[in-house]
């Protein structure tokens, strides 16, 4: 079985909570834009996201008072480098995690952080994980601030400082399901967690030990999965997604996942246009 078959995502450009994959659009918007959708080839489009971002369609929607931006934000996957190896931005990452938080209602999506989070006020360093579990910590889902009990937590960090352009994306996943909880660090290049992350993991462990009897920290770094210069972002998101879909962390310490898998995974992450 391919590693991509172990997760529940697909190459459809629809956001994953949309069950009807024949169309990502709401019925109202489908009806209003029928003529455009039926002749999308004449617009130079091969997808619904292309149609609703076309200038002519946007102008028509504005005249009709249709909110196409809401359709894009809530019913489609995030924009991003789907069919090329462009480097992922923090927007690509955070917008993807926000959409996953709609599908996984017990997932806490934390905004990205740079590695100087101990001195810069990133959300990542302010979260109390016990409050995440109890539903006392604010998160943003579908553009709204909500509080809800979460038994999983995910964040993507960059190994550069805030003053730099960015170096390498890594993943944090906290699993508060089952009997033994875990605080996990994944680096596709196989490098060990730096000091700030080690301190963060230990602090979170102490938070969780106040409400649960068994908590461990894990550095999932014994295999160098990534050989390219471009796929650290997809690897980091893939780790979080695989763990949400109950793929064990042990898979990542026993089996190398190739860059070719990440090229394919990009089509699972982002919409077509």
Swiss-Prot record:
One of its GO terms (molecular function) is cysteine-type endopeptidase activity. The active site is at 168, 187, 232 (nucleophile). It comes from the Viruses. Induction: Expressed in the late phase of the viral replicative cycle. Keywords: Host cytoplasm, Host-virus interaction, Hydrolase, Inhibition of host innate immune response by virus, Late protein, Protease, Thiol protease, Viral immunoevasion, Virion. Substrate binds at residue 226. One of its GO terms (biological process) is viral protein processing. Pfam families: Peptidase_C48 (PF02902). It is found in: Host cytoplasm; Virion. It is an enzyme of class 3 (hydrolase). GO terms for cellular component: host cell cytoplasm; virion component. Its EC number is 3.4.22.-. The keyword DNA damage does not apply. SUPFAM superfamilies: Cysteine proteinases (SSF54001). InterPro entries: Papain-like_cys_pep_sf, Peptidase_C48_C, VPRT. Belongs to the peptidase C63 family. Cysteine protease that plays several role during infection including processing of the structural polyprotein or inhibition of the host immune response. Catalyzes the maturation of the pp220 and pp62 polyprotein precursors into core-shell proteins. Plays a role in the disruption of host pyroptosis via specific cleavage of gasdermin D/GSDMD. In addition, strongly decreases the host cGAS-STING signaling by targeting IKBKE via its enzymatic activity. Also impairs host FOXJ1-mediated antiviral effect via degradation of FOXJ1. This is Cysteine protease S273R.
